[in-house]
Amino acid sequence: MRGGQKGLPFYLFTLILLLGGCQQNDGKCYIEGTVNGEKYEGKRIFVVPLNGPTTAEYVDSMEIKDGKFHFVKDFTKDTIQMYKILLDYHYRMGLQPLFIVGEPGTIKVTIDSISHATGTPQNDSLEQWKVQTEIHNRQLGMMRSNIVNLNKQGDSIHAKYIQQRADSFHLAYKNYTRQLAKNMEGLVLGDFLKNLYPLTYKRQLPDGRIVTMNADTNEEIPE
């Protein structure tokens, strides 16, 4: 009898783990979020498909309570896809809309001036890319501002040098995005990233011919 009592806590612990694991593997996406700022209390927040219909039957919404919100997407019914989380348009100023991949598991979301989402494989990768994107945008913006100021001062030599650095910096970021898209090939995030910086594009010439152009150099690729 005593042996059975000793085994009971271990049994309960195992049962708790199994039940906890069920939530992560039941084909549902649990979005658990917080919004920083008391002024958003009671305001509505929305989960909107990034692509496709955005009519009422495809959009989820709820009121923020105690700075928190919670959504459940059932992927036995819904298609795994990209979503955008954002507040009612009257209250979006100062808050960054957030892209997420709606996939099974629990996604931890923070809506703020810089928003974040982590907790599932694709969303963890998306968050890492988002951090790199913010660094890229900030530094590239500073370089471009510097170029404008140098040109105003008549210093075209230094402006040209910084432009070359900016071009190289931007190309490195595009290649980083392309490589991540390749690593995520076949997944929703891979498709999203792949469409951001294609390697080529088509252009119609004055004579009517359609040619393939290098997206990085804007030069024609010989057939």
Q: How would you describe each model-predicted region?
A:
Residues M1-T34:
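Bacterial Sec-dependent N-terminal signal peptides
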Residues C22-K174:
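A non-transmembrane, solvent-exposed segment enriched in polar/low-complexity residues
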Residues G37-E38, Y201-R203:
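Alpha-helix capping and inter-helical loop/turn segments
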Residues T120, L187, E219-I221:
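Serine-centered coil/turn micro-motif
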Residues N151-K152, K182-L189:
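Surface-exposed helix-capping loop/turn segments at secondary-structure junctions
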Residues S168-E185, R203-R209:
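Amphipathic alpha-helical coiled-coil segments
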Residues G186-T200:
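Amphipathic alpha-helical repeat scaffolds of TPR domains
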Residues D207-E223:
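N-proximal helix/coil linker or "cap" segments that precede and/or mark the start of modular domains
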